[in-house]
Amino acid sequence: MATKIRLARAGAKKRPFYQVVVADERSRRDGRFIENMGTYDPTKNPAVFKLNEEKILAWLSKGAQPTDTVRQLLKKAGILDKATA
């Protein structure tokens, strides 16, 4: 089972809010997920990004691949550097 760390959309129309989740790559964007890692709210200025760093590092060590958007957010938070070190 290939796993991805990706964003699942929530919130109302025109007011997006995202959950950072670990999910099987075959499941739908907002469908079944394995574990919730945090939240991302792009509507705030600046955008609010909360993560459980320990869980993220654990899943990265297990081989979960972040999507491009999540990879950028992890770089901004400095978590991706810890995973590669």
Swiss-Prot record:
Amino-acid biosynthesis keyword on record: no
Pfam families linked: Ribosomal_S16 (PF00886)
Coiled coil regions in record: none
Family: Belongs to the bacterial ribosomal protein bS16 family.
GO biological process, one term: translation
Keyword Lipid metabolism included in the entry's annotation: no
Protein name: Small ribosomal subunit protein bS16
Gene that specifies this protein: rpsP
Keyword terms: Ribonucleoprotein, Ribosomal protein
A single MF term (Gene Ontology): structural constituent of ribosome
Disulfide feature: none
HAMAP family from the UniProt entry: Ribosomal_bS16
One cellular component (GO) term of this entry: small ribosomal subunit
Organism, scientific name: Pelobacter propionicus (strain DSM 2379 / NBRC 103807 / OttBd1)
